[in-house]
Swiss-Prot record:
Family recorded in the similarity comment: Belongs to the DOCK family.
Region (Disordered), start-end ranges: 1651-1704
Disease tied to this entry: Immunodeficiency 40: A form of combined immunodeficiency characterized by lymphopenia, and defective T-cell, B-cell, and NK-cell responses. Patients suffer from severe invasive bacterial and viral infections in early childhood and may die without bone marrow transplantation.
UniProt organism field: Homo sapiens (Human)
Protein name: Dedicator of cytokinesis protein 2
Length: 1830
């Protein structure tokens, strides 16, 4: 195989197919992956992925597209740069970055944004292809670049990526080659642009914002139109007149573009095919702001009078007849809102003339109003909006606008009239006429023939232009309307004649009737005429507007004789004025007379740069004709309309300077001319004429020629200044100062021309005059007269504008000196704001770019800045002044940044010495939300950036004393730290932030050198300074903008390549500075532990290795000082918690910390053991903290609670009270979020254990986190108790609440003697007692959960927990929630503990099953009648032991009687703490397993059955309204052998000689079982007796059957096992049931077990059901309480039926056959009594001599009868709507005097006596451990 060789040209490639690597050396690729190629061999490359450089390997060449690159070598590294254009590279990078975000948006289901990004990416991909094609014309490429950059910037903004700053050409600015100030301004501009862009994107009206912004920013615009085709069935030649039209004003606003179309459907001139292009130019912003603009096309047919006429020979040809119009609304295209593309074709539908009185102009209005069907006829055009005038667009769009493109100008002047734009166009519009028919029978077909005639009547050739693109003609013939009395032509033509001919020409209009027949038409002559002169007698042109002309009649030959009509009036108003002396038709001369019945009107518009319509202006322009009126005309100029003046700007200025030049020896007109010049300059300064600035500039440079004007201008100006300085009145001075810029331009230009003409003659005199002129200005500035204040402000504002020009003819240094005097002569506190603004203008001038000028000007500027910045002024003024100050300083720094360093050294030094500290203090005192803060910070950054090493050294030496230097360094460090912590720039200004960081880093290191030199020695050591340094450095290293790992790959590389990893540099500096401290280190322990820890946690390996040893140095330092390092240890534990919770730290850090510290300790044996202990401590804490952080974002709050408790225990074990309490409250908050009020109370209770009932002040570490006010132990404990009691109340843990209430009551009664609080407390206790008795508390289920496998976090891995379920929570629901938390986990279907293979497997395995709580005995309830409401609470609370029973088969199985071989395997669990507690679950700390024999199982089952019977008897005795069905089911299931088989199976299994013989040790158990069977008979008898009383008639047969079965059963049992007797239950009083916790527990009313378990536990399982039942023992479930009405006397609490869980809890009353399958079927919630006690639930210790040891404490002391309980019964008929979950139920309270109380006592005494006889026999079998208290 060929060897691998280094890749030469093939260095950079992109994967174009997916490649799946098959082995280790092969690198898998996806389409689009960018690879760096290192070596090549045959068909393979070796390299790595650009995004993941660690992924290296080989890949086939055919899968890679090679990209051209250039290799740039920097130091020892090669930087490979793609060869494609930068913008294409940027698009590529952007697509990578957006692509990643695009996928994330999809995952996050953000559909709208996902589609938006997708659309933008498609656009960028398409534009990238166009960029790379290299085929775009220059203008299109420029526009495309703008679109691309705009789209990228917009996309980055909405995706919250970094802002990209660009230059004017759209290229990304390089911070290395851009000044800080320029970079800052570029960020500001980019932000503003994007903000505007986003506004436009949100507005659907302006989609093409880039074009819109370009259009709106230019004063002149053009519309390019290309006529592609004209589709229309005419059959004759046609003329197409296209123009722009304003429909609101109903006026045409441009010249017509004429296209002559042939009858065959082609242009008449075939070379014009595909070349019909026109540009409508001179459009200004006013035109763009019109509401509507239409492109209209008026079509005139040229041919016969009527198209329908046949016989072409007889018809008149060549008539211009109206045919139709085409109209298109182009408003959006004009304004740049709609797409403007020269390739997109637009169809303009054609609308024909339908009647003769449909004038083309009138038809436009109709077409606009109605959108009719054109039938496919119309005009096809493409159009594009172009920016600029005709000269500009010829340069910018050469492919569109070439020599063949026709130019159609605007009707009127453009907004800017350039000096070279000589124009003399007069637009004549034929408006309308009204012609009498006289002797004709029909109305005439009038044709107007217009021509331009000289004085002698001869027609001027080629003077009329019908439309742009057409040749000039001698005469114009109008459209002919057939037999219309009042034709309205509205046809516009242009008259263009030389200016010198204007005075002698006039327009002549001939009117002729045109006949449709050629023969008649030849005989027709002109029947009338009109004329009008274009110039008036006073030399002005005809006024724009409408003109009613006189119609002259007479001899047609005379009409061509000018002498015949020129003496007659041409306007109708002239005739009307003479009407008193002349008759209506008598005005005639030479055969022509005025027709009073005929009317003809025209309108004119003069667009001439040479002819004016103003008499005053004309007088000035022609001043030589009447020199005696010169003074008057000069004075009149000020009242001439400004528009007229600027229109003739060049001629007016020429006239003024000619007057000045021709009177050079006299000063007679100097002031008048000067004032006139000032007036004109002032006009141009007006906003209305601001665009004429360019005209004036052009005039001065190209047309101005008055070489002596400068002398006169300077003289008059100095006179004005001197007059004003003396406080005398000088009215024009303010206008003069405002016009100062152009006055000096004229002065300088005049002097330049003079100097060129006379080769520098009189230079000294000129400079002296200029110096005296500036001295006059300075004298004005010194003046103290009130009248001069405004003038001084004006001078400050306008003086800088003259510098550019003065500098050309005057010594720059001298000029600078004059300016220096100009500013220094103003009093220090006067006009400061204006001075600063003026100085800013000077700084931006060319003058300031010269070193010698800066030497003079900079000191005065810095002095002014310093004074102004240090002033204390009111806020509003301060903001303005500071704004001007920072602008000025920015301008100075900007200028200096682009100069050679050698020429700016002293200037930077000047700024540094004078202003650095002032700027720093301004930043420090300025609020971070101040509008100018970012400007000042940028300014400060720029100063520091431009300071060299020598500057730093020099600046340090400027401080006179050490304390001053320390103050400066402290200020700077504090400011830097504050700016790093609160960045003044927006978050997306990445470039600006990084440049600031780079500058700050250099400054910090420079100042650190100063600290080493001056403040390290013991005598000079400055602790606070060093402390500030370390805190600043750590703040710098840990700031978000430097954490590269958090950034995208593109951003990571961008920062690393441009700025490097600044964290390493500062980190190494911190290390070095620490080790230099020597003996001073101890001062920084423990203060610096936290910051150093924060630094070491940065995930950068080299940095960690360099800085972690500092920890050991700290430990060693403290150990040597005090013999231990407790301070360090305490601080590290405190800070570590905070840092890891904040997201810092990882497994690698933990390992690195351990290895480095142990390595360091190995070199110091005396401290090694302590270090090892410390490392173990920190490692344990880190593990727990990382676990905690790992679950903080987890949806599972359970995991968060577990980790919180782990940390609690850690801090408790290590006596960290403050941290312990902090996490207590975190745990409390988590519980409250989950409504775990009980657990929240227990959590808060832990805090109270740290407090005493004393009045001493609480230490800070035992206060609640964030608590402000100091409290005593008693106050805090009392407050906490009240909160906890509230939580216990919400969690229905009233027993606990009462306990705390009692403790509080004791304090109120015995310690603080606050009886008012005591009374409230006792009321609260009473309420809790009442709640215990009246409010239902559902019993929670408990679940064992095992987490097996290495996939779980350490706090769960291979551990078992017991969970306390929520109210009514089923195992299925709990398990589903559990699996949701661990979606990748596998559910285990077995309940046995898994083997090591599962525990060590990499996956996750979850085991979940229900367990039963085991109660501990409560001694205080022994031998006392306790209500079941009290007892039931303890059945599922305060429990720490649980068990799970599972049936197993042993020995031979008898298919007819499986009980004999049915053994129970019982697993017992002991948790770390009792439940409920601070968690809803606790880890199992001990597990054991026992086995229960079939006989013991039978005893348990019989005990359960007896308990159920007794419980139900109690229920029915207590409530006579209960339904009978449940009792029927229970009794029938036992007495009828057909249903369940009764206890016959026990007899077959155990009561045999064979069993007794084989199991002699079970004799006592057999006796016990027989005793239970015997006791069942009286219980059944009592139940049947109750049933007999309650049974309805329809169930009487059922009862009789059941009674018969019972008699048979009774006989059999009493015969076999003896007789048992009970007292008569009829005598028992209806009251609250009570329990005796002695030998047996009496009937219970509320059974919590029945509340929260499934109804699936039969009392006596069959062979089919036993396995399932014992594997998951459950009890019936009830959803909610049902209150008893207040008036009821029922003593029990009832349950309301659930509507939602009918399928699980509601079963109908079953027949006997169905009842055979179960001893108790589930019924409707209202009709079912549910057992809450299955004795198998409560057994936790294996039987030795008695089954009782397996029972709950309530039944463990019972010798012969098992513990019995009754479940809660539902009461039918109660209104569920009134139920409240917390509603207390009313119970009948029985007084001691009740006469039935004795009956109850007798019953209780009976049970005591009956059971006492057995207690001696069984008592010895009860383990002592079970009799202990809770």
């Amino acid at each position: 195989m060929a060897p691998w060789r280094k890749a030469d040209k093939e260095r950079h490639g992109v994967a174009i197919y997916n490649f799946q690597g098959s082995g280790a050396p092969q690198l898998s690729l996806q389409i689009g992956d960018v690879v760096r190629i290192q070596e090549t061999c045959g068909d393979w490359y070796r390299g790595y992925l650009i995004k993941h450089k660690m992924l290296q390997g080989i890949f086939p060449k055919s899968f890679i597209h090679i990209k051209e690159v250039t290799v740039e070598k920097r130091r020892n590294t090669e930087n490979i740069i793609p060869a494609e254009i930068p913008l294409a590279q940027e698009v590529t990078t952007t697509l990578w970055e957006w692509g990643s975000i695009w996928k994330q948006l999809y995952v996050a289901s953000k559909k709208e944004r996902f589609l938006q990004v997708q659309s933008m990416m498609y656009d960028l991909m398409e534009w990238r292809s166009q960029l790379l094609s290299g085929t775009l014309p220059k203008d299109e490429l420029k526009e495309l670049k703008q679109k691309v950059t705009s789209k990228i910037d917009y996309g980055n903004k909405i995706l919250e990526l970094d802002l990209i700053v660009r230059d004017e050409d759209g290229n990304i600015l390089d911070p290395d080659n851009t000044s800080v100030i320029s970079l800052f301004h570029a960020h500001e501009e980019a932000t503003d642009k994007i903000t505007e862009r986003i506004k436009e994107e949100m507005s659907k009206d302006q989609p093409d914002y880039a074009m819109y912004s370009r259009i709106s920013s230019s004063p002149t615009h053009s519309l390019y139109v290309f006529v592609r085709n004209f589709v229309c069935r005419i059959g004759e030649d046609a003329e197409l007149f296209m123009s722009l039209y304003d429909p609101n004003k109903q006026t045409v606003i441009s010249e017509n573009y004429l296209v002559r179309w042939g009858s065959r459907g082609f242009p008449k001139e075939i070379e014009m095919l595909n070349n019909l292009k026109v540009v409508f130019t001179d459009l200004g912003n006013k035109d763009l702001n019109r509401d509507k603009i239409y492109l209209i096309c008026q079509i005139v047919r040229v041919g016969k009078m009527d198209l329908k006429d046949t016989g072409a020979k007889k018809c008149t040809q060549g008539l211009r007849r109206p045919f139709g119009v085409a109209v298109m609304d182009i408003t959006d295209i004009i304004k740049g809102k709609a797409e403007s593309d020269e390739e997109k074709q637009h169809f303009i539908p054609f609308h024909p003339v339908t009647a003769e009185n449909d004038f083309l102009h009138s038809l436009l209005g109709k077409v606009i109003a109605s959108k009719g069907d054109s039938g496919g006829q119309g005009l096809w055009v493409t159009m594009k909006m172009l920016v600029g005038d005709i000269i500009q667009i010829r340069k910018d769009y050469p492919h569109l606008v070439d020599r063949t493109t026709v130019v159609a100008r605007k009707l009127g002047f453009p907004e800017i009239i350039m000096p070279g734009d000589v124009r003399n166009d007069i637009y004549i519009t034929l408006l309308q006429g009204d012609f009498d028919k006289y002797n004709k029978t029909t109305q005439r077909n009038v044709e107007v023939i217009m021509c331009v005639c000289a004085e002698d009547g001869k027609t001027l050739p080629n003077a009329i232009c019908v439309g742009a693109g057409d040749k000039p003609m001698n005469e114009y013939r109008s459209v002919v309307y057939y037999q219309v009395k009042q034709p309205r032509w509205m046809e516009t033509v242009k008259v263009a004649v030389p200016i010198e001919d204007m005075q002698r020409i006039h327009l002549r209009f001939m009117f002729r009737h045109r006949s449709s027949l050629e023969s008649k038409d030849k005989g027709e002559k002109n029947f009338a005429m009109s004329y009008v002169k274009l110039m008036k007698e006073d030399g002005t042109t005809l006024h724009d507007g409408f003109h009613d002309l006189v119609v002259l009649k007479g001899d047609s030959k005379k009409m061509e004789d000018a002498s015949a009509y020129l003496t007659l009036p041409s306007y109708r108003h002239h005739v009307e004025n003479k009407g008193a002396t002349l008759s209506r038709s008598s005005s005639s001369v030479g055969g022509l007379s005025v027709s009073s019945r005929d009317v003809f009107s025209i309108s004119t518009l003069v667009c001439s740069t040479k002819l004016t319509q103003n008499v005053g202006l004309l007088g000035l322009l022609k001043w030589r004709m009447k020199p005696q009126l010169l003074q008057e005309n000069l004075e009149k100029l000020k009242i001439v309309d400004g528009e007229e003046v600027v229109k003739f700007l060049q001629d007016t200025l020429d006239a003024l300077f000619n007057i000045m030049m021709e009177h050079s020896q006299s000063d007679e007109y100097d002031i008048l001319v000067f004032d006139a010049l000032i007036y004109i300059i002032g006009l141009i300064a007006d906003r209305k004429f601001q665009h004429f600035n360019t005209v004036l500039e052009a005039y001065i440079q190209q047309h101005f020629s008055a070489t002596l004007a400068y002398k006169k201008l300077m003289t008059v100006l100095k006179t004005y200044l001197d007059t004003s300085s003396r406080g005398e009145q000088c009215e024009p001075i303010l206008r003069t100062l405002k016009a100062l810029e152009y006055v000096f331009k004229f002065i300088v230009r005049s002097r330049t021309l003079f100097s060129q003409l006379y080769e520098g003659k009189e230079q000294m005199e000129f400079e002296e005059s200029m110096r005296r002129l500036f001295e006059s200005i300075n004298n004005l500035m010194k003046s103290q007269y009130k009248t001069t204040i405004l003038l001084q402000v004006a001078a400050l504002k306008y003086i800088p504008s003259v510098l550019h020009d003065v500098e050309m003819v005057f010594d720059a240094k001298l000029l600078s000196q004059l300016l220096y005097e100009f500013y220094t002569c103003i009093p220090p506190v006067k006009l400061q704001k204006q001075k600063v603004q003026s100085m800013n203008e000077i700084v931006q001038s060319n003058l300031f770019k010269k070193q010698e000028c800066r030497d003079i000007l900079l000191p005065v500027i810095t002095k002014e800045l310093k004074e102004l910045l240090e002033q204390k002024d009111d806020m509003q003024h301060q903001v303005l002044e500071r704004k001007y100050c920072v602008e000025l300083l920015n301008s100075i720094l900007e200028v200096l940044s682009y100069q050679d360093a050698a020429f700016t050294y002293h200037h930077i030094q000047e700024i540094m010495v004078q202003l650095l500290r002032t700027v720093n203090r301004t930043v420090i005192t300025m609020g971070r939300d101040h509008i100018l803060i970012s400007h000042f910070v940028a300014c400060m950054t720029a100063i520091l950036n431009q300071m060299g090493d020598q500057h730093y050294s020099f600046y340090i030496e400027t401080f006179q004393t050490s304390s001053e230097l320390v103050d400066f360094l402290m200020e700077t460090f504090i400011m830097f730290k504050d700016l790093i912590g609160k960045n003044v720039y927006p978050g997306d200004w990445m470039a600006m932030s990084m440049v600031q960081n780079r500058v700050f880093l250099r400054a910090i290191n420079k100042f650190a050198e100063t600290m080493n030199q001056k403040f390290l020695e013991h005598t000079n050591f400055e602790f606070q300074l060093w402390n500030n340094y370390f805190h600043l450095a750590v703040a710098f290293i840990t700031q978000d903008s430097l954490q590269l790992e958090q950034f995208s790959h593109a951003k990571y590389n961008k920062i690393l390549n441009k700025y490097g990893d600044m964290r390493r540099l500062i980190g190494f500096s911190i290390r070095d500075m620490w080790y230099k401290l020597g003996q001073n280190k101890i001062c920084f322990i423990p203060g610096m532990v936290g910051p150093i820890l924060e630094m070491t946690l940065i995930p950068e390996a080299e940095l960690r290795k360099a800085t972690i040893p500092i920890f050991f140095d700290m430990m060693l330092c403290e150990y040597q000082r005090s013999g231990d390092f407790k301070k360090f240890e305490n601080e590290i534990i405190l800070k570590l918690d905070h840092e890891v919770e904040g997201g810092r730290g990882d497994e690698q850090y933990m390992q690195l910390l351990e290895s480095i510290l142990m390595e360091c300790a190995a070199e110091h044996p005396t401290i090694a053991k302590s270090v090892e202990n410390f490392v173990n401590l920190v490692k344990g804490l880190l593990e727990k903290l990382l676990d905690y952080r790992g679950v903080m974002t987890d949806e599972s709050k359970d995991n968060r609670m577990s980790c919180t408790v782990n940390l609690l225990n850690f801090y408790k074990d290590n006596n960290r009270e403050e941290m312990y309490i902090r996490y207590l409250y975190k745990l409390r908050d988590l519980h409250l979020d989950c409504d775990n009020y009980t657990e929240a109370a227990y959590t808060l209770l832990l805090h109270t254990w740290l407090l005493k009932w004393s009045d001493e002040q609480c230490a800070s570490q035992v206060m609640q986190t964030g608590q402000q006010h100091p409290q005593t132990h008693r106050q805090l404990k009392e407050t906490l108790y009240e909160t906890i009691i509230g939580y216990f109340d919400k969690g229905k843990m009233w027993e606990e609440a009462i306990s705390l209430c009692k403790e509080l009551a004791e304090q109120y009664e015995m310690e603080i003697f606050d009886y008012e609080l005591l009374s409230q407390n006792l009321i609260q206790q009473a309420k809790f007692y009442e709640s215990i008795m009246k409010i239902l508390r559902p019993k929670p289920d408990y679940f064992a959960v095992g987490y097996y496998g290495q996939g779980f976090p350490s706090f769960l891995r291979n551990k078992v927990f017991i969970y306390r379920g929520k109210e009514y929570e089923r195992r299925e629901d709990f398990q589903m929630q559990l699996m949701t938390q661990f979606p990748n986990a596998e559910k285990m279907n077995t309940t046995s503990a898994p083997g090591d293979d599962v525990k060590n497997a990499p996956g996750q395995y979850i085991q979940c099953f229900t367990v039963q709580p085991v109660l501990d005995e409560h001694p205080r309830f022994k031998n006392k009648p306790v209500p079941d409401q009290i007892i039931n609470f303890y059945k599922s609370n305060y429990v720490q032991r649980f068990h799970y029973s599972r049936p197993v088969r042993r020995g031979t199985v008898d298919p007819e009687n499986e009980f004999a071989s049915m053994w129970i395997e019982r697993t017992s669990f002991v948790t770390a703490y009792k439940l409920p507690g601070i968690l809803r679950w606790f880890e199992v700390v001990h597990m054991s397993q026992t086995t229960i024999s079939p006989l013991e199982n039978a005893i348990e089952t019989m005990s359960t059955a007896n308990e159920k019977i007794l419980m139900m008897i109690n229920q029915y005795q207590s409530d006579e309204t209960l339904p009978i069905n449940p009792l029927s089911m229970l009794l029938n299931g036992i007495v009828d052998p057909a249903v369940m088989g009764g206890f016959a199976k026990y007899e077959k299994a155990f009561f045999t000689e064979e069993y007794v013989r084989d199991h002699p040790e079970d004799q006592d158990k057999l006796t016990h079982l027989k005793d239970l069977i015997a006791w069942q008979i009286p219980f059944l008898g009592a139940g049947i007796k109750i049933h007999e009383k309650r049974v309805s008639d329809n169930l009487r047969p059922f009862h009789d059957r059941m009674e018969e079965c019972f008699k048979n059963l009774k006989m059999k049992v009493e015969k076999e096992y003896g007789v048992r007797e009970m007292p008569d239950f009829d005598d028992r009083r209806v009251g609250r049931p009570r329990s005796m916790l002695r030998s047996y527990r009496q009937m219970s009313i509320i059974s919590l077990a029945s509340m929260n378990s499934d109804c699936s536990t039969p009392s006596k399982p069959t062979s089919e059901s036993f396995d399932l039942e014992l594997a998951s023992p459950k009890t019936p479930r009830v959803e909610q309480e049902e209150p008893i009405s207040p008036g009821s006397t029922l003593p029990e609490v009832k349950l309301r039926r659930s509507k939602k869980r009918t399928k699980r809890s509601s079963v109908v009353f079953a027949d006997e056959k169905a009842a055979a399958e179960s001893d108790l079927k589930r019924l409707s919630r209202k009709h079912e009594f549910m057992s809450d006690t299955n004795l198998s639930e409560h057994a936790a210790i294996p039987l030795k001599a008695s089954v009782l040891s397996q029972m709950s404490f309530a039944s463990q002391s019972m010798p012969t009868i098992p513990a019995l309980a009754l479940s809660v019964a539902g009461i039918p008929g109660l209104d569920e709507a009134n139920t409240s979950p917390r509603l207390s139920q009313t119970f009948l309270q029985l007084s001691d005097g009740d006469k039935k109380t004795l009956t109850r006592k007798k019953v209780n005494q009976f049970f005591k006596t009956m059971l006492a006889s057995k207690s001696a026999e069984e008592g010895k079998q009860i383990p002592d451990s079970l009799s202990t208290d809770l």
